């Protein structure tokens, strides 16, 4: 797995794999962002009330999870 320092940040990690050590886990990030990170393999557009184009990475990836 990639080093923790090089992973994209995620404020709210949703579903995660259950591996040991914890650094081996991949998660789905629940953050809605202006642009998906480079390593995202399934970037989906999210409908918002503001009309601004926002996206969510819906694939399991390596993140630095805040929560």
Curated annotation (Swiss-Prot):
One of its GO terms (molecular function) is serine-type endopeptidase inhibitor activity. It comes from the Eukaryota. Disulfide bonds join 10-29, 16-27, 36-43, 40-57. Keywords: Disulfide bond, Protease inhibitor, Serine protease inhibitor. This is Bowman-Birk type proteinase inhibitor A4. Belongs to the Bowman-Birk serine protease inhibitor family. One of its GO terms (cellular component) is extracellular region. Expressed in bulb (at protein level). It comes from Hyacinthus orientalis (Common hyacinth). GO terms for biological process: negative regulation of endopeptidase activity.
